[in-house]
Amino acid sequence: MARSRLPATSLRKPWKLDRQKLPSPDSGHSLLCGWSPGGKARPAGNTGAWAPAEQFFPASNRTREGGGLWPPLPLQSSPAAPTMLDSSAAEQVTRLTLKLLGQKLEQERQNVEGGPEGLHLEPGNEDRPDDALQTALKRRRDLLQRLREQHLLDELSRAQAWSGPSRGALGSALPPELPPTGILPTASPSPLAPDPPRIILPTVPQPPATIIQQLPQQPLIAQIPPPQAFPTQRSGSIKEDMVELLLLQNAQVHQLVLQNWMLKALPPALQDPPHVPPRVPRAARPRLPAVHHHHHHHHAVWPPGAATVLQPAPSLWTPGPP
């Protein structure tokens, strides 16, 4: 314990502090200073404590013009530190400014949509660059709209060209395609709104086109039986049958009248022998009209004198040659 106390007392002795007043050359007032272990006086500074500056900085850095030691030594001892800080800060500021400028340029390009037209127009119209940019943007938008309209019209025309041959030459399928063609010129001034329905129209009527192809086949089948019905009506019509029967009767009566005239024209010597043979065919011939009409029986029964009464009849009938 004695040994440990001795060095403590020995260390305390050189660190004795004696306040001493030293005049400062810059200011007429005195400064408080203390004693270091080496016995040399050091300025106390603002806090009144000494600072070992000789170990890190030479005396030339601590002194100033006039021999004064104010401001404190730690600030004067490192003259290179502020220069490094200033250079790094300047670099950071320049980098930030460059970034800001780049962002502004990007925003301007985005507003202009990356088009070189506005850049070319700016030097020509240096007095009003904003107007030139706006006009250029409007022109570009108009051109884009026109191009889109042309593309849409081309697509629609192609779709119609493909849909036409696929559907065939059916008249029922063509009318649904005609209305969209009439709508196209009316909708050309405002293409953006009605364009999507235009593209949908050719796709929607395709399934009904198959149904339309089946529908006309049914009427064709329905039209086939009517021509078959007409001949059935003709075959079973009563009027036509009556007309045919009347014509046949007229022809037969005409033949009978002619035969009677021929017999009368013959001389009397020849009339006696031939009277017997022709009477047999007369009785046989009327059998044919007997099936059609009952009037022919009377002709067969009539005597030869009755034939003379029938002579004026041909003038009334005046039928043509059979």
Curated annotation (Swiss-Prot):
<protein>
    <recommendedName>
        <fullName>Uncharacterized protein C21orf58</fullName>
    </recommendedName>
</protein>
<feature type="region of interest" description="Disordered">
    <location>
        <begin position="1"/>
        <end position="51"/>
    </location>
</feature>
<dbReference type="InterPro" id="IPR027904">
    <property type="entry name" value="DUF4587"/>
</dbReference>
<feature type="region of interest" description="Disordered">
    <location>
        <begin position="107"/>
        <end position="130"/>
    </location>
</feature>
<dbReference type="Pfam" id="PF15248">
    <property type="entry name" value="DUF4587"/>
</dbReference>
<dbReference type="InterPro" id="IPR038915">
    <property type="entry name" value="PRR29-like"/>
</dbReference>
<feature type="compositionally biased region" description="Basic and acidic residues">
    <location>
        <begin position="119"/>
        <end position="130"/>
    </location>
</feature>
